[in-house]
Amino acid sequence: MNYNKKTVADVAVTGKKVLLRCDFNVPQDKRTGEITSDKRIVAALPTIRYLLDNGAAVIACSHLGKPEPVFDKWVKKQTEKGKDPAELTEAAWKKSLAKLTMAPVAERLAELLGREVLFAHDVVGEDASAKAAALQPGQILLLENTRFERGETKNDPDFARKLASLAELYVSDAFGAVHRAHASTAGVADYLPAVSGFLIEKELQVMGGALANPKRPLVAILGGSKVSSKIGVINNLLEIADTIIIGGGMAYTFCAAQGGKIGDSLLESEWMDYANQMLQKAADKGVKLLLPVDTVIADRFAPDADTAVVEAGKIPDGWQGLDIGPRTVEQYCAAVADAGTVIWNGPMGVFEFDKFAAGTKAVAEALSKTDAITIVGGGDSAAAVEQLGYADKMTHISTGGGASLEFLEGKELPGVACLLDK
């Protein structure tokens, strides 16, 4: 896939209405609706400011949350109260989704920009159409949650066309959503010239560069609970990496595949053959595939569980592995110290419990001290690095969880493929 895409800096924007897809899917307090982290809004500011400073009229849009489960829960409650589900119409759909409105995002964006952010109470309805039509250069309008329109997640051409009709140019800056072929991330590019914003440009340059032309040795650290979620990543990185480090719950499937005893540890037995195939492929290609040599075990899955450290493959019945052990930490950190490029995706243990966070903390610290190019995938790894205060020591922390994972798999990303090539 070609990652050399045109950016907002490559096209004329002055006097144009620009549809800007951002990733404003921010975490909120469940009770008050208050935004608990504005990191994703801040990440979009460079592109927004560039467009406004260069005389564009910006029509920003994003999704927020998952409306369908919220609606289903609401319908269930109404049904329990004696309402007929058939009577819960489109108006009811919108009423049930009030908590997923983009209004708080508009308020926070206005504070960060230091200027007014107009807000449309729909996506392609009368309010959005009127406000978009009246929008002047240097002004910004935020549309309501794109997922309030059922055609969004279906990539419905009719909805995509209506959304595109509000503007003259499409700019995609929502890396966290480019792995989804939705109307606002891919479909609109069928009706408008489409380029990337600065956030996506950086993601493509840094992550694409690490895969296409890495400073070697290239070390990939893969954690998380399941082998099944990392199949494509391991397979793709075996073609590129010099060393692959396995941690987290998925290490126990590899261990069991080699005949080790893993007690009550997480096991995906259906993936044991695959694990052995990957070990053989690594050997055939001369890639070092490092597995834990010791593990921190617990008598139950709880933050206050009794713990012990045992050799890998020798976990007694009734116990489960929840973190990599100290000798493994030493080996993994040594590999990081010698690396030219490090890509990290997934924690080494149950990071949420202090007793089983040492492995993840040690890897994060090792990345903070190395001279290598360090790239942290989104999700739990990024959260760990930020929580530990090492974020500013990393070369790049990806803004996309699922998107960065699919990038590492070598998959085509619909929200990138639809952009104009340079």
Regions found by a protein language model. Give the residues of each.
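Active-site loop-to-helix "anion-binding N-cap" substructures in soluble metabolic enzymes
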Residues: M1-K422
